[in-house]
């Protein structure tokens, strides 16, 4: 704020406005975009926070149960590839997945129907027999709109925050 001649409150309001202006677009998730807009090294800041990344205690048993049932385990994330790499480095999640896809590779976020068509073409997944789990109702809506039959919301994706509820999808802790 001060380096731009505005108060911290004005800076916060400008960032909030920018944040809302790109909500539900790929830029909302893009570290490069925010680094350029804010003049900060967001990738370095993300790397510094890497040790905070942790898996829920039920994640690996769930993924292994899917594997043992013959199910393909695909992570589709809106996370920027750098952010994803940092999280994987600190969690080892990739060892429990068959495929990892960043929406940045496709050029569309999960909120965009074009992404679902591109991912289906890339992976051959059958929407009628797919379980999709997310913590964002708009994304669950987009998956359901595409035709994914089983959409499930995670009610406590961040143990440091209050539990979430979903208006249009079943939720699971």
Briefly describe each language-model feature range.
Residues 1-61, 69, 80-82:
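N-terminal helical cap/lid subdomain that shapes the substrate entry/recognition surface
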Residues 60, 64, 71, 80-81, ...:
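Asp-based, Mg2+/Mn2+-dependent phosphohydrolase catalytic module
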């Amino acid at each position: 704020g001060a380096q731009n001649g505005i108060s911290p409150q004005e800076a916060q309001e400008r960032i909030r406005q920018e944040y809302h202006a790109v909500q539900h677009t790929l830029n909302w998730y893009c570290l490069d975009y925010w680094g350029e807009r804010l003049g900060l090294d967001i990738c370095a800041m993300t790397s510094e926070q890497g040790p905070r990344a942790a898996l829920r205690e039920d994640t690996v048993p769930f993924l292994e149960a899917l594997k043992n049932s013959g199910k393909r385990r695909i992570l589709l994330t809106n996370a920027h590839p750098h952010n994803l790499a940092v999280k994987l480095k600190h969690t080892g999640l990739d060892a429990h997945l068959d495929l990892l896809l960043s929406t940045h590779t496709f050029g569309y976020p999960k909120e965009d129907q074009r992404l679902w068509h591109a991912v289906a073409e890339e992976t051959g997944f059958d929407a009628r027999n797919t379980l999709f789990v997310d913590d964002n109702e708009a994304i669950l809506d987009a998956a359901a709109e595409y035709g994914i039959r089983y959409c499930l919301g995670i009610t406590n994706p961040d143990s440091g925050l209050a539990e979430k509820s979903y208006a249009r999808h079943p939720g699971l802790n």
